[in-house]
Amino acid sequence: MSDIQRSISRLLHFAQQKGLIAPADAVYAANRLIDVLGVEEYVPHAVDETLETATPVLEEMLDDAAARGLIENTVNERDLFDTRIMDCVMPRPSEVVREFRAHYAASPQEATDWYYRLSIASNYIRKTRIDRNIAWKTATEYGDLDVTINLSKPEKDPRDIAKAKLAKASSYPKCLLCRENEGYAGRANHPARETHRLIPLDLCGAAWFLQYSPYTYYNEHCIILNGDHVPMQISRHTFENLACFLRLFPHYFAGSNADLPIVGGSILSHDHYQGGRYTFAMERAATEQE
């Protein structure tokens, strides 16, 4: 049991280093952690380390939870549980929005830099998985082409697949992009989003939200989602909204998938755009005139 006590101390230390919690929050966070982890008490341990991500500590906690029968040792069960653990050291949504706006007052880039770091520190963006992705550039007659192989989505465990088939049907949240995902605990067939924090945006007078993609296909891959669950539809408003977003975040790009099945976006049921801080081959390509 002393090992899990030390893991709790390590996570509290990490959370304070990354600014997820303040020293005044430590006792409160520790009590939440012992409840989630099924531990009766907390005995602080001295910790002197600097970690890039919480993954090493979370792996210790997950192994311990599986050994004690708290969770089944599958990818989905571990992902659901480590998200619940990290929520114990997360700021509330209103605190994140307030901090984002304070940084935005200095500069939009400072705000997104802070928000992206938060998304990694919270393990919402699983950096250790993202780092496995393979990317390279290939020279073609049309210019350098970016090629990526995304390996950040883990393989499904047969036990998780079986559980998902038996899971009770639910229409809440309506889809993976709905704002109701913020704080949602997840289930066998829906990922946990307890560490998910949205940034409200006003695009052309309508309520939209900013978030980062947890799978990150390119640098600072963000999603701009409609506050309402309405289907994707390319129209004049699409380009007006994209232009409005770029006025708010001039250091980002923004674009929309097609509103067509198969060739378009993967979630056509919810209006959204994608953006980020990356220069694609199309932007670097020379123009031709006939």
Can you describe what each PLM-predicted range is?
Residues I149, Y212, S256, G275-R277:
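Hydrophobic side chains in beta-strands
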Residues Q233, H251-A254, L260-S266, R277-E290:
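Conserved His + Asp/Glu catalytic blocks
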Residues A192-E194, N257-L260:
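Short acidic (Asp/Glu) patches
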Residues C222-I223, I234-H237, A285:
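A short secondary-structure junction signal
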Residues E194-L201, G227-A254:
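Helical scaffold of the NTase/Pol beta-like nucleotidyltransferase catalytic core
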Residues M1-I224, D228-P231:
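Active-site microenvironments that recognize anionic phosphate/pyrophosphate groups
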